[in-house]
């Protein structure tokens, strides 16, 4: 069973591990730099909310939630999700997205937008669409993969 809750400081090392795994895979996050304990603590503390998915074995997934813009567009937020590779396909991502959607509303955001969903990430796209997110279009070659090739990205919102 998975529980999603707000992160606490002792969670940071496990969060960094999950985050860095996705960064190293190079097919979902735009970030290229890995987090260390200091940069991870600062990064997670700067978010509007970080949620962690916890099982008996520890933290197996996480999300970050923050404003996507400022001023007149400050009611739009953005989020990123990470699930450890050995736990994918077990609906942990869905639990994270649902908790994030609830948190976004509680924080006063009116729109949740994903700027750069890699078109080849079929599992994420199916999940977002099943939860009611709408695809805004496609940006050809908007994401540079680890192998140097460029993949399309699909912005989504709800």
Across the structure, where does each feature detected by a protein language model lie?
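A short beta-loop-alpha structural element at the N-terminal edge
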Residues: 2-15
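Helix-loop element at the rim of GNAT/NAT acetyltransferase active sites that forms part
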Residues: 16-33
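Acetyl-CoA-dependent GNAT
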Residues: 28-86, 97-98, 103
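Conserved beta-strand-loop-alpha-helix junction that forms the acyl-donor binding cleft
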Residues: 88, 114-124, 142-146
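Conserved GNAT acetyl-CoA-binding A-motif
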Residues: 104-117
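Conserved acetyl-CoA-binding loop of GNAT-fold acetyltransferases
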Residues: 129-139
């Amino acid at each position: 069973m998975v529980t999603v809750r707000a992160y606490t400081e002792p969670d940071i090392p496990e969060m960094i591990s999950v985050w860095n795994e996705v960064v190293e895979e190079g097919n979902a996050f735009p970030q290229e730099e890995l987090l260390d304990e200091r940069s991870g603590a600062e990064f997670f503390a700067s978010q509007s909310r970080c949620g962690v998915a916890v099982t008996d074995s520890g933290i197996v997934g996480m999300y970050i939630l923050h404003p996507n813009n400022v001023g007149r567009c400050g009611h739009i937020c953005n989020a990123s999700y990470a699930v450890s590779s050995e736990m994918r396909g077990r609906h942990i991502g869905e639990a994270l997205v649902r908790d994030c959607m609830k948190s976004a509303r509680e924080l006063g955001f009116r729109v949740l937008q994903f700027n750069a969903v890699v078109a080849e990430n079929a599992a994420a796209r199916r999940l977002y669409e099943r939860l009611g997110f709408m695809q805004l279009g496609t940006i050809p070659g908007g994401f540079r993969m680890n192998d140097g090739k460029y993949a399309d990205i699909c912005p989504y919102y709800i």
